Design a protein with these regions (language model features):
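Non-ligating segments of multi-cofactor redox enzymes
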Residues: 1-248, 254-278
Length: 278
């Protein structure tokens, strides 16, 4: 399998976004879908509380692992994410993540474009450990339920997709607005600004799902392979990579989202991305 056509990727991204948000009519009245499909996790980042959302939030499910005694759901959620990680790695980010598509569209806004300082990519691992695992455990109450710290204090997807639409639809919710909402609104605005300037800013800096899937890039079935005999060392693959990865030197980089831009740019047909089952 070779991935070279960026139009195909965009079609799949749009289809994944649409399937993740089937209940558009729920925006009218600010309802949240709570049907049987909410038992399943979206592989990408999409807020549970978004009125249109048809699947559960995987980050919320992970926080349930940390702060809940409901191990049946917890182990199911972990197993599902591990399955996606082993099968696809960060190809989930590049092909199936609704919030990832949003970031790419925002980046199209005309502006100066910046590169990301290398050290910033490690922030997402700190967020994963502290806000998805440590804080939910530390805040577990006497009923064995912890607070979803990432969702409550950081997640810009939740603010954009869930918080703002629900506040717009419900007067009683607007009366409860306090400092926490303004903090999350500031994080959302900073995220949007970052995504305008830097390609997939949130995905690369702060997304805990990106951290998890990135760690699994080296073992995932979806691989990037470089044929050393065909490679002419022209450097075009490195220049076109918006995630700032050098595919020749580091094909299993935790930052590679398997988008296929490098394969499309390679004049020697030396780069292949697909499922490596041997």
């Amino acid at each position: 399998m070779r991935i070279k056509n960026p139009v195909k990727r965009k079609i799949i991204q749009i289809a994944a976004f649409g399937f993740s948000n089937l209940h558009l009519l729920n925006f009218n009245g600010g309802k949240i879908y709570r049907g049987s499909w909410k038992q399943f996790c979206n592989p990408g980042l999409n807020c549970y509380s978004c009125p249109a959302a048809s699947l559960a939030c995987p980050v919320g499910a992970l926080q349930a692992v940390s702060g809940s005694m409901n191990f049946k759901f917890s182990f199911y959620a972990v197993g599902l994410l591990l399955a996606f990680g082993v099968a696809l790695g960060r190809a989930v980010c590049g092909w199936l993540c609704p919030f990832g598509l949003m970031q790419e569209l925002v980046h199209r806004i005309p502006s100066p474009k910046l590169k990301l300082k290398k050290g910033f990519v490690y922030i997402k691992y700190v967020i994963l450990v502290v806000f998805v695992f440590v804080l939910p455990v530390a805040a577990t109450n006497y009923m064995g339920m912890g607070k979803p710290a990432f969702c409550q204090y950081i997640c810009p997807a939740g603010t954009l997709e869930g918080g703002i639409p629900l506040l717009a639809a419900h007067e009683e919710l607007r009366q409860t607005i306090g400092p926490l909402f303004f903090l999350k609104l500031a994080i959302l605005l900073a995220t949007i600004a970052g995504c305008v300037l830097i390609y997939r800013f949130f995905c690369r800096v702060a997304c805990p799902l990106g951290a998890i899937y990135g760690l699994m890039n080296k073992i995932s079935v979806c691989r990037l392979r470089v044929d050393g005999q065909k490679c002419v060392s022209c450097g075009k693959c490195r220049k076109v990579c918006k995630m700032e990865v050098d595919p020749v030197k580091n094909p299993d980089s935790a930052e590679c989202i398997r988008c296929g831009a490098c394969a499309a740019a390679c004049p020697a047909d030396a780069i292949h991305i697909g499922f490596d089952i041997e």
